[in-house]
From Swiss-Prot:
The gene is rpsE. Residues 12-75 form the S5 DRBM domain. Belongs to the universal ribosomal protein uS5 family. One of its GO terms (biological process) is translation. It comes from Shewanella frigidimarina (strain NCIMB 400). This is Small ribosomal subunit protein uS5. The keyword Ribosomal protein applies.
Length: 167
């Protein structure tokens, strides 16, 4: 119940991407613990991801959610899609995303889809290359979204107005 109340209080969407059982081998045998990868977002351009580890699954998920809330970034969106095609990478994972017309939907796989949904992107075409490790895909996707610039940001950087940028 406390989790639901917290979710309603700050109005963030939460998605659990992966839960994994890991083990530590010690002299007496194996010690099992669990890891959880989560993303949170407000559906309007704010996203964060978190990775938690604990001896029990609920504790790992809770830690991951808390880390995701602390690790929030803001992304400039263009009416539910991207401003321009973007690439992101993290270690062996590379992602490519491009804007799509209204009604296309989110064409993305697994972990990338979860990030785009909580970010508030509704129409996008995307592809993951290289490693499909969920942690690396999430980090590459966030990297790509953070490096996306709106026409206003590009115009300000070049010292022009938006109409001159758009041609």
């Amino acid at each position: 119940m406390a989790k639901l109340e917290a979710q309603q209080k700050d109005d963030l969407q939460e998605k659990l991407i992966a839960v994994n059982r890991v083990s530590k081998v010690v002299k007496g045998g194996r010690i099992f613990s669990f890891t959880a990868l989560t993303v949170v977002g407000d559906g309007n351009g704010k996203i964060g991801y978190g990775y938690g580890k604990a001896r029990e699954v609920p504790a790992a998920i809770q830690k991951a959610m808390e880390k995701a809330r602390r690790n929030m970034v803001t992304v400039e969106l263009n009416a539910g899609t991207l401003h321009h095609p973007v690439k992101g990478r993290h270690t062996g994972s590379k992602v490519y995303m491009q804007p799509a017309s209204q009604g296309t939907g989110i064409i993305a796989g697994g972990a990338m889809r979860a990030v785009l949904e909580v970010a508030g992107v509704h129409n996008v075409l995307s592809k993951a290359y290289g490693s499909t490790n969920p942690i690396n895909i999430v980090r590459a996707t966030v990297d790509a979204l953070v490096h996306m610039k709106s026409p206003a940001q590009i115009a300000a950087k070049r010292g022009l107005n938006v109409d001159e940028i758009r041609g």
